[in-house]
Amino acid sequence: MDNRLLEILVCPLCKGKLEYDRAAQELICHADKLAYPIRDGIPVMLADEARQSVPGRAVNPDGPASGN
């Protein structure tokens, strides 16, 4: 991900800073605990496409935590 793009992108909900997770290909908003996917190199900045993100584990917004 281009660092210049990362500097201007913000969470669409809280307008907070995002962190790039290279391994998961996601942009993480720690304030809202959301992970926005990056598909084919393009960040998908739609709240409906984000998944809940909790440090240390992923949480499915429609079901139980994964990894349990």
Swiss-Prot record:
One of its GO terms (cellular component) is cytosol. Belongs to the UPF0434 family. InterPro entries: Trm112-like. Coiled coil: none annotated. This is UPF0434 protein H16_A0605. It comes from Cupriavidus necator (strain ATCC 17699 / DSM 428 / KCTC 22496 / NCIMB 10442 / H16 / Stanier 337). It holds the Pfam family Trm112p.
